[in-house]
Amino acid sequence: MNNWQHFFNNPVDLSEHLKKPYFRFDNRDKEITAISFDEKANLIWSGDSYGCISSYDPTFQLYTRYRGHIGGNSVKDILSHRDGILSISEDSLHFANRRGVTKLNLTSIDIAAFSELNTMCYSPHSLKNNIYCGGDNTNWGIASIDLNRGCLDSLLNYSSKVKLMCSNNKVLSIGRQTGTVDLLDPTSNRTIKSFNAHSASISAMDLRDNTLVTVGKSKRFYNLYADPFVNVYDLRTMRQLPPVSFSKGTTMGSGGADFVQLHPLLPTVMIVASSSGSFDFIDLSNPTLRTQYVHPCQSIKKLCLSPNGDVLGILEADNHLDTWRRSSNNMGMFTNTPEMLAYPDYFNDITSDGPISVDDETYPLSSVGMPYYLDKLLSAWPPVVFKSEGTIPQLTGKSPLPSSGKLKSNLAVISSQNEKLSTQEFPLLRYDRTKYGMRNAIPDYVCLRDIRKQITSGLETSDIQTYTSINKYEVPPAYSRLPLTSGRFGTDNFDFTPFNNTEYSGLDPDVDNHYTNAIIQLYRFIPEMFNFVVGCLKDENFETTLLTDLGYLFDMMERSHGKICSSSNFQASLKSLTDKRQLENGEPQEHLEEYLESLCIRESIEDFNSSESIKRNMPQKFNRFLLSQLIKEEAQTVNHNITLNQCFGLETEIRTECSCDHYDTTVKLLPSLSISGINKTVIKQLNKKSNGQNILPYIEYAMKNVTQKNSICPTCGKTETITQECTVKNLPSVLSLELSLLDTEFSNIRSSKNWLTSEFYGSIIKNKAVLRSTASELKGTSHIFKYELNGYVAKITDNNNETRLVTYVKKYNPKENCFKWLMFNDYLVVEITEEEALKMTYPWKTPEIIIYCDAEELRKPFFSVDTYSINYDILFRDYFANGIRDTARREYKLLTHDEAPKSGTLVAIDAEFVSLQSELCEIDHQGIRSIIRPKRTALARISIIRGEEGELYGVPFVDDYVVNTNHIEDYLTRYSGILPGDLDPEKSTKRLVRRNVVYRKVWLLMQLGCVFVGHGLNNDFKHININVPRNQIRDTAIYFLQGKRYLSLRYLAYVLLGMNIQEGNHDSIEDAHTALILYKKYLHLKEKAIFEKVLNSVYEEGRAHNFKVPETSKG
């Protein structure tokens, strides 16, 4: 840090606006009280004693100024936020965007705890959605403010005066007026550690990661003097480290430290300054290594460091702002990734030499001035005509088009007639206005100045996570169709972070049959289901593909802690399973929906022949199919479990009687309960018994119902009236309910506020299930079961008649002994209130699948796979899909138990893929090309080699080719080395394994804590469909990255290692071994401290040769 220069020789007066003539009779102090750099824009902010907040660009030109606090209260503290700027005064909190427009303003009238405030900081774990405010008022403690809701979230009991506050991702550090520092855990509202930092008071404090630094004052001879040292604390061990001396108090005379701040990018570097002008940059790892500077001024009032660590702002006692800058930062940038600033539109007077034609589209009509007028214009319509300006009539219900399928409007008839004209050779494609715009429409006028100032920041996080709306007919943003931009490799370039502020992972919709994501999320939060499915991973269940892949998916979602996951492997198993059953039945279908229709209709009593009914009931059919298949595969596991059978199984007795006195009784074990329409007379009687309209009568009726239909009697062979009575004989711990009601029935449901009850009680009385809202109504029965709502899947229908599925789940928090509700809309996850979750009055919301769990089962903990004894045998043996072929050449050596991997073991990996389907693009009416369906790939080969030093260093222990019976569009032989027929079990001479076998090997290595070395591992792991923790990845593509240009493995091997690889087709063993050597080279360059120099030369040479390896002359 020895290249700092006093860059700005003419300091700017930040209090110039306080020297206006109208302030001359005001005797209050006219000072700047706070300064702070913006983390998202090249701005520095200041607050004054009159409550005004001002911002300046790097040239110190005024950008914006606004009054944030009324009443003449001074600005106490300023915080930078991703959406704007936060500031506090003694009794108010103000939140505005960078243009000065108020987003939130809270005063002591709104929150009584706002009194004598001094400081604020962000709350741990909140991702800057909550802040803590504290001050001298000890009656209220510390107030937690929710910025999303704009209200008081909670109050922390704290009985001391607060002067300073800062936080990391775990604790809240509080500096008292007396000089003591307290570490507070916001979760438990408990002080976990206190440090007696300074004897009199604390002056400055900063916290970053696990390092806390403080400076303060001590009392000597009835006066306060700054301490000539900096206190340093390690929050991992909760101990104080040796204090670091300040040069002002040692080598440069008497004095002490008044300011301290940790470097934002270098975690071990801090800046320490004195109010007299001297300041040091000190390395905590080596305190003797420091650089000393002196700022020429009378005294320093405030000091702050820019987010990129290149600019030091100093506020002098006369309210002038001066800066020091590093010599490398001549542009004066405050942040490395600044957002574009918005500027006002300026009116340009357009002069014309002659008259302008009315048809001239290049001339804006808004530039024609309006004459002054005294009379009322004809265009000013009276308020009698329109109730409000610029509004459209509100919707009074759902789409007017009938959805029952029985009545067709004229539009539907015309549409069906047009569809008959469509052929396979000449398909009929409807014109889509949303994609191609209005027909024969003149393009809108676009000003070039607006294009220059346009900000492509996308959706606001606070907007997209809003799950309520004032108008109940309007679909809130959280339920809307989410934006998704696909690139060449799917959704790699899409930023999912603004859509999830929780620790629970969403699912990527970029998969086939993505509507199944909602049902997967529903069952992931059932404790008994999760524990069993994940527990099956401890054994090698290679024959139960769907159960195993669901277990891997649940485990990945649990480990990812909010990172988005993909269900691509689960979808592949689902497709292979349906293909297998279709071949067995001799009825091939093209899509999963068609297969579910053919599978589920046979077991259903009702007739779902209309195409609309198939669409309406597809989630219910998939739910029934999923549970049935999981229960079937459960019996095929190593331990032959019956957990799911006991958990979901409904013992149903079906009695069939014919008018010819013939009857038959069968007993079936059904995994789910279908709830269909109920007779109005029956529902009224059941509602009277349950004391109100709710879901209980529907469940009761579904557990014991009678249906009649005319059919041929199997005994007499005549057409008779057959009566079928279905009775449920037990109450399992989990009730999976499938709702198949008509729109008219849902309309009646929406009129009831508490239709979806949160809990109920049930018992079996006289071989019949009886359900009541309270336990007192079931007195006299021996066994009473309490059920609570675990979650449900709802269908959202927007104004465009587009539908999507969302999931509501209830998660138990054992630490706080309470539940919280979450809503999943693919990759959007938001925590909601219970009232909102149970609300069924919205016309756009329709429940599809509902889960009720036993109250005790719902409170069981979720066990990860780490709690089980895992079988690792597959790492030490082969498991081929097509048997061992003598002609196959073995290029690897299996691991032995003596070299069993452990945590930190280095392995190098490379994967190859084939293309199943090419990408699909479209060009809209503006000529913009976008990828609407990325290419589909499949894993073809994985090679893993040893990375630890020893005799077998660099020798592969896994080299598996993956079976693929699907249609392969492109083998990508040039890049993958896979030839046609290599993956076909009937033709291949390779050692083929199934996908779940090779996946288990990679999963076990991750489970053991192995460190993976490779080139472009993010892309490999995405296609393998596994989320590996960052601390277990050593990606050479990122290590040798400068800017945004990724270097190929072949080029890096040629430049750094002198190796010429990939001369023919790619070989995964060669690529993995090269990446391992390249990683060793990286460590060597880092150890010699010449890595940056070598990397610069690599890029300089690469630009000269276009980053390509020179072709070797042959012959």
UniProtKB/Swiss-Prot annotation:
The keyword Signal does not apply. Residues 474-855 form the USP domain. Its EC number is 3.1.13.4. One of its GO terms (molecular function) is poly(A)-specific ribonuclease activity. CDD domains: PAN2_exo. One of its GO terms (biological process) is nuclear-transcribed mRNA poly(A) tail shortening. A divalent metal cation binds at D910, E912, D1020, D1071. Belongs to the peptidase C19 family. PAN2 subfamily. Pfam families: PAN2_N, RNase_T, UCH_1. Positively regulated by the regulatory subunit PAN3. Negatively regulated by PAB1-binding protein PBP1. Inhibited under stress conditions. Inhibition of deadenylation under stress increases mRNA stability, which may be a mechanism to retain the majority of the cytoplasmic pool of mRNAs for later reuse and recovery from stress. SUPFAM superfamilies: Cysteine proteinases (SSF54001), Quinoprotein alcohol dehydrogenase-like (SSF50998), Ribonuclease H-like (SSF53098). This is PAN2-PAN3 deadenylation complex catalytic subunit PAN2. InterPro entries: Exonuclease_RNaseT/DNA_pol3, PAN2, PAN2-PAN3_catalytic_subunit, PAN2_N, PAN2_UCH_dom, Papain-like_cys_pep_sf, Quinoprotein_ADH-like_sf, RNaseH-like_sf. It comes from the Eukaryota. WD repeats lie at residues 27-66, 112-153, 155-194, 197-236, 295-334. Contains a pseudo-UCH domain. This ubiquitin C-terminal hydrolase (UCH)-like or ubiquitin specific protease (USP)-like domain is predicted to be catalytically inactive because it lacks the active site catalytic triad characteristic of thiol proteases, with residues at the equivalent structural positions that are incompatible with catalysis, and it cannot bind ubiquitin. It functions as a structural scaffold for intra- and intermolecular interactions in the complex. The linker, or PAN3 interaction domain (PID), between the WD40 repeats and the pseudo-UCH domain mediates interaction with PAN3. Its cofactor is a divalent metal cation. Keywords: Cytoplasm, Exonuclease, Hydrolase, Metal-binding, mRNA processing, Nuclease, Repeat, WD repeat. Residues 337-473 are annotated as: Linker.
